[in-house]
C-alpha cells in the first residue's frame, strides 16, 4: 500500500532524529474524534481555543471527571495534541490570545480511520470500482493514441501515468484498507458471538444466527461486486501494458501496471478467502451448538423445557424451530450429522437405519430388477426407474438412493446414444424438482 523511495534505515533515522511518538489514551482519542466531528461541520476548517475547551468539556463530562480543573486539563490536552502533531497551532503577534487550530494530516488520518472508515458497503465499493473503471479505460484509450502517434515521455506521464498513479492506485489502496477493516469487523462479530453463547440459550441462538447470516451476506455481496469488475479492470490494464512493450523509456508505466495488477489480484482473492474462512467459522459455531445440546444428554435441557411448558401461562414464550430443508443443506459429505456423536442419544423410535444396511437392500433389489430387464433385452430408462423407486423413500434419502441406482445401472450396460455426442433431456425424478440427465441404456455387457 505504501510506496516510497526511502529505505528502511533512512526512515528509522528520520523518525529517531525527530523523536516521533504517539500516545493516545482513551480520553485523548475521544477528544481527537470529537474535534474531528466538530471540524467537519465547519466551512473554514479552523477552530479557536474556546471551541476546543468546549469540546473537551463534553468529553470530560462523559468520563465523569472533575469540573473544577477543566480549563487546566483542556490546556494540557490541547498542548499534547499539538506536540504529537495531531493539531497545528497558528498565532502571531497580533493574535497572541486568539490562536487558530487546524487538524494535521495525521490527525485527519487517525480520526478518519475510527469514524469514516468504519462504514463500508457494497454501494461504496461499486462507486469506487466505477471510478477506477472509467480512469483505466480513459488511460488505455490515451495509451493507444500515444502509441499510434509516437508521443513523447511527457505525454505518457501526464495522460497515462498520472491517472493510474494518483487516482487508480489510491482507490485500490482505499479498497484494501476497507477490506482490512472488514477483517476487524469479523473478529469483533466472533467475539460478540462467543459472548452470546455464554448467556441465555434462546436469545443466543437467534442472535448468533442473525450475525452469521448478515456477515455471510455482506461478504458474498462484496465478492460478487469484485468479481463483476475484476476481469474488466485486468483487461484494460493489459491493453495499456501492450502499448508500452518494447518501449524502454516507458519502464515506469510498465512497473506501475505490474503493481496495480498485483493489488487487484490481492483485493479479489481476499474476498474469496474471507468467504471460505467465514464458512468454516459458521460450521464451527453450529457444531459447537449441536455439541453443547448433545452434552446435555436429554436431561438438563429437557428439564428446562418441561419447566418452561409448565409455567407457560405465567411466562409465555416463543418456540424457535428449524426448517428441515436447511438441515439438509448443513449435511456434509461424510454424513457427520447422522453420526451418534452429532445427534446425541435418541429414543429408539427416532433412530434411522444405517446407510450401509439401506445400501445392501437397494443393491439386492435393483440387481434383481435390472438383471431381469437385461435378460429380456429391454432398455433401461433411468429417469423412469428413479422416479418409481424414489416414491418409496423419504426425501432425505433420495440422493443416496439415486446414487446407488445409477451405479448399479451403469454396471450392466451403456447407452448407444452416448456415442452420438447429443445431450439427453433433463427429466424430473421427484416432486421437489430433482432432475436427471441420462440416455436410455440399451446395450448390455
Swiss-Prot record:
UniProt similarity note: Belongs to the MukF family.
UniProt KW Calcium keyword: yes
Top-level taxon of origin: Bacteria
Keyword Calcium (UniProt): yes
Oligomer and partners: Interacts, and probably forms a ternary complex, with MukE and MukB via its C-terminal region. The complex formation is stimulated by calcium or magnesium. It is required for an interaction between MukE and MukB.
Assigned keywords, A-Z: Calcium, Cell cycle, Cell division, Chromosome partition, Cytoplasm, DNA condensation
Pfam families membership: KicB, MukF_C, MukF_M
Species of origin: Mannheimia succiniciproducens (strain KCTC 0769BP / MBEL55E)
Function in brief: Involved in chromosome condensation, segregation and cell cycle progression. May participate in facilitating chromosome segregation by condensation DNA from both sides of a centrally located replisome during cell division. Not required for mini-F plasmid partitioning. Probably acts via its interaction with MukB and MukE. Overexpression results in anucleate cells. It has a calcium binding activity.
GO biological process, one term: cell division
Gene3D superfamilies the record matches: Chromosome partition protein MukF, middle domain (1.20.58.590), MukF, C-terminal domain (1.10.225.40), Winged helix-like DNA-binding domain superfamily/Winged helix DNA-binding domain (1.10.10.10)
HAMAP family referenced in this protein's UniProt entry, alphabetically: MukF
UniProt xrefs under InterPro entries: Chromosome_partition_MukF, MukF_C, MukF_C_sf, MukF_M, MukF_M_sp, MukF_WHTH, WH-like_DNA-bd_sf, WH_DNA-bd_sf
Residue numbers spanned by region Leucine-zipper: 212-240
Gene Ontology MF, one: calcium ion binding
Designated name of the protein: Chromosome partition protein MukF
Any Gene Ontology CC annotation: nucleoid
Protein localization: Cytoplasm, Nucleoid
